[in-house]
């Protein structure tokens, strides 16, 4: 068993991925042209230096706190969990980064989130207009905001809270989204920092999910290749079909 473990570990791991991103709360009706035939969708923007992808889109939903490994992040809640909807829509725009080890990835993400949390369940909120003008959002500035936050947090300035990558990625994405829906994103849109998604290290596998150890397959998220329930299930069906024909 030890020799099998050693063979599997030696040179088997590639990179570890971690996603961080701003959670966006906007007017629900602005994306109706995209969502008229589906409950949610994934939108992805390819930039020269990054890829930004929407995650966990919740039309008429709310934003809640997510507690994970001692970290507190903004997350989305389906409106059906409360029985009534809101005029808002929320999603996270994730941008992945890759590290040589799981430890490096976790240190990078947790340090950013912990700095925001400040030892409690602190989450920072900023108006889109304020972000674009590089000024902090204040309590007074929120009094007349037409989009009401579904989660209470500290109003502030994302520029001093998170790395520029996630701000620039959001700005680029929203610009393309405006072109796509052919209307400007409401400047009262609210931005919550910061959501995160952690992954297992990517393991070297072939096209059939088989590792360097003959006959040992990794199905689902443990491979670091699939990243959701549907992808994990699909990989299981794929490998099962392959095994039934060999």
Regions found by a protein language model. Give the residues of each.
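Residues forming the flavin
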Residues: 1-246
């Amino acid at each position: 068993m030890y020799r099998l473990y050693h063979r599997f570990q030696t040179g088997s791991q590639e990179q570890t991925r971690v996603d961080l991103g701003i959670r966006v709360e906007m007017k629900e009706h602005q994306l109706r042209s995209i969502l008229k035939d589906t409950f949610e969708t994934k939108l992805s923007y390819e930039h020269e230096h990054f890829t930004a992808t929407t995650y966990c889109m919740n039309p008429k939903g709310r934003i809640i706190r997510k507690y994970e490994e001692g970290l507190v992040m903004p997350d989305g809640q389906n409106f059906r969990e409360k029985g009534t909807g809101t005029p808002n829509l929320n999603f996270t725009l994730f941008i992945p980064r890759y590290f040589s080890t799981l430890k490096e990835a976790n240190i990078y993400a947790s340090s950013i989130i912990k700095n925001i949390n400040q030892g409690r369940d602190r989450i920072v909120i900023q108006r889109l207009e304020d972000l674009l003008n590089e000024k902090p959002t204040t309590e007074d500035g929120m009094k007349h905001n037409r989009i009401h936050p579904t989660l209470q947090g500290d109003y502030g300035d994302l520029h001093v809270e998170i790395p520029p990558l996630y701000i620039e990625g959001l700005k680029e994405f929203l610009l393309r989204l405006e072109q796509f829906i052919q209307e400007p994103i409401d400047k009262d849109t609210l931005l919550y920092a910061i959501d995160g998604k952690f992954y297992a290290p990517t393991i070297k596998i072939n096209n059939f999910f088989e590792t360097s150890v003959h006959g040992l397959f990794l199905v689902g998220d443990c491979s670091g290749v699939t990243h959701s329930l549907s992808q994990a299930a699909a990989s299981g069906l794929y490998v099962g079909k392959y095994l039934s024909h060999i």
